[in-house]
Amino acid sequence: MGVFNRLRSFYEARIAPTVASFLSRISPDPNIYTLASPVAAAAALPAWLYISPVASLLLIALSLLLDAVDGAVARFTGRVSPLGSFLDSSLDRISDSLYHATLYIAGVHPLIVIAMLSGGLIVPYLRAKGESLGLEVRGRGLMERGERSIAILAILAISIYNLQTALALASAAAVLVWITVIQRMVYIAGELRR
C-alpha cells in the first residue's frame, strides 16, 4: 500500500468523520461541496493572472479540500447516491483540466501540460473501466489523483520562484502519469486474461 493510500485510509478513518460532522452543519448536501470544487479551480485561473500566484495556489488547495470532503459529508449524512458519485467523478475531471490550465498560465510548456492532462484523464478512466468489469483498481499505479494533485501544487509553487525547476518537475510528473497508465493497463489486461 502506497504512502497516499495509507494517508487516505487515515483520513477516512480519523479525520473525515470530524470534518464531515462540522461541514454537515453548514450544508448537509454533499453536492454543494462537489459543485464548489470546480468553481474554486476555475477561480484559480484569473487569480494567477490578476491577483497573485499565491492566491491561485490557495484556491486550488481549497478545490482539492472540497473534493476530499464531499464524500465524507455524503457518508456522514447518509446521502450517498449514484447522482453524487456521478457528479463527483465528472466534476473531478473538470477540476483536473482547470488545474492543468493553471500550469499552462504559470509557464509550463504546452506539450508537458498536454502530456500530464491526457495521462491524468486516462488514469481514472482505466479505474472506472476496470471496476465496471469487476476489478479493484484503486491503489494501482504511481500517480493516482492525490499524487497528481500534490505534484501540480508543487509545480505551481516552484514555478513562482524557478520556472526551469518547475518544468523539470512537470516533465517528471508527466512521465510518472504515463507510467501509471501503463501499470493500470497491464494490471487490468492481466486480470481479464485469468
From Swiss-Prot:
It is found in: Cell membrane. It holds the Pfam family CDP-OH_P_transf. Its cofactor is Mn(2+); Mg(2+). Mg(2+) 2 binds at residues 67, 88, 92. Its EC number is 2.7.8.39. Pathway: Lipid metabolism; phospholipid metabolism. Catalyzes the formation of archaetidylinositol phosphate (AIP) from CDP-archaeol (CDP-ArOH or CDP-2,3-bis-(O-phytanyl)-sn-glycerol) and 1L-myo-inositol 1-phosphate (IP or 1D-myo-inositol 3-phosphate). AIP is a precursor of archaetidyl-myo-inositol (AI), an ether-type inositol phospholipid ubiquitously distributed in archaea membranes and essential for glycolipid biosynthesis in archaea. It is an enzyme of class 2 (transferase). It is a multi-pass membrane protein. One of its GO terms (molecular function) is phosphotransferase activity, for other substituted phosphate groups. Binds 2 Mg(2+) or Mn(2+) ions per subunit. The chain crosses the membrane at residues 32-51, 58-78, 103-123, 150-170, 172-192. One of its GO terms (biological process) is phospholipid biosynthetic process. Mg(2+) 1 binds at residues 67, 70, 88. This is Archaetidylinositol phosphate synthase. GO terms for cellular component: plasma membrane. It comes from Aeropyrum pernix (strain ATCC 700893 / DSM 11879 / JCM 9820 / NBRC 100138 / K1). The active site is at 92 (proton acceptor).
